[in-house]
Amino acid sequence: MDFPSPLIRGRLVSRYKRFFADVVLDDGTPLTAHCPNPGAMLGLNTPGLTCWLSRSDDPKRKLAHTLELVEADGGLVGINTLHPNRLVAEALAAGAIPEVAGYASHRREVRYGENSRVDFLLEAPDRPRCWLEVKNVHLMRQPGLAEFPDCVAARSTRHLRELAAMAAQGDRAVVLFVVQRTDCDRFSPAADCDPKFAAALAEVASAGVEVLVYGCEIDAARVRLGRPLPWDTSGTGRPA
């Protein structure tokens, strides 16, 4: 996924009300940008962090700039929660995720479960349907260890239960964690942030839900889905 125009560098002043970020650009210009991330963004809100913004010329937008990347712990972190689904859609079209390659079609936002919409439904005439949920990961508290979630994630826990129900019916069910960081080489659930999610992930992984974790290649011009990363469901990735 290429950014539509070169990103603009600045420094974060503050992030507030979840969706707003005050930034000072490298040329000294202060501005308020849209922050496309409703989560806690632990470790990514620190004033003074270098950040990268995209700019839109759409006159209907209230804020022309969007916070896209933050430099933290020596690496780049993608904070836009819309990107993982776009990255996965791009990778599916290219057959770049071997574990779910070979399906004739994929549809997005298909209703299932308890009034939910699955991110992707993969279909082919010669194999069971594949229900695929995508989760964005940007938390790192120990060197190299990506964690999810960074706050209580009741909706994500419900998605795991719904995937397990699809697996019980004989379909494939997959949860794909997309790690939008360049400094992580493994993944574990953050049990201290949400013990129910961590327990549910371990449970559904034993009940037929496939767990995939992929890293990302990130720079100021583009984001690409990277290589698969190892994972475990121990939830022991808490800081000492």
Swiss-Prot record:
Pfam families: SfsA, SfsA_N. InterPro entries: SfsA, SfsA_C, SfsA_N. GO terms for molecular function: DNA binding. Gene3D superfamilies: 2.40.50.580, 3.40.1350.60. PANTHER family: SUGAR FERMENTATION STIMULATION PROTEIN A. Belongs to the SfsA family. This is Sugar fermentation stimulation protein homolog. It comes from Phenylobacterium zucineum (strain HLK1).
